[in-house]
Amino acid sequence: MIQPQTYLNVADNSGARKLMCIRVIGTSNRKYANIGDIIIAVVKEAVPNMPIKKSEIVRAVIVRTCKEFKRNNGSIIKFDDNAAVVINQEGNPKGTRVFGPIARELRESNFTKIVSLAPEVL
């Protein structure tokens, strides 16, 4: 469950290292984001000489959460960190690589490009 003011790691090579969620995309009073949801975030840490700079406003999709996520088949999945992938307006990732495991629910949310770049899909 990601809410405003939550810090997230970045799971791609776009140049950002840490993000802070400032808005959950959806209905006007939506409080939390889960795996596969889009957020608006600000870059808190960035790698030098990369396209994404510190204090830049970006869109990102949640790929891992510490909070348990219950699947339809009854199994529960949770990760060690909160992580997101920076995307553009069309929903394609800005980076060319994705690090760490990715949840299978992203395929159902039509983020197939992120799933294809991921080294492991759980």
UniProtKB/Swiss-Prot annotation:
GO biological process: translation
Main location: plastid
Domain of life: Eukaryota
ATP-binding listed as a keyword: no
Subcellular location: Plastid, Chloroplast
InterPro entries in the record: Ribosomal_uL14, Ribosomal_uL14_bac-type, Ribosomal_uL14_CS, Ribosomal_uL14_sf
Keywords: Chloroplast, Plastid, Ribonucleoprotein, Ribosomal protein, RNA-binding, rRNA-binding
CC terms in the record's Gene Ontology section: chloroplast; large ribosomal subunit
Classification via PROSITE patterns: RIBOSOMAL_L14 (PS00049)
Gene Ontology molecular function: rRNA binding; structural constituent of ribosome
Function statement: Binds to 23S rRNA.
Family, per entry: Belongs to the universal ribosomal protein uL14 family.
Subunit structure comment from the entry: Part of the 50S ribosomal subunit.
Protein name in UniProt: Large ribosomal subunit protein uL14c
Organism: Marchantia polymorpha
Gene responsible for this protein: rpl14
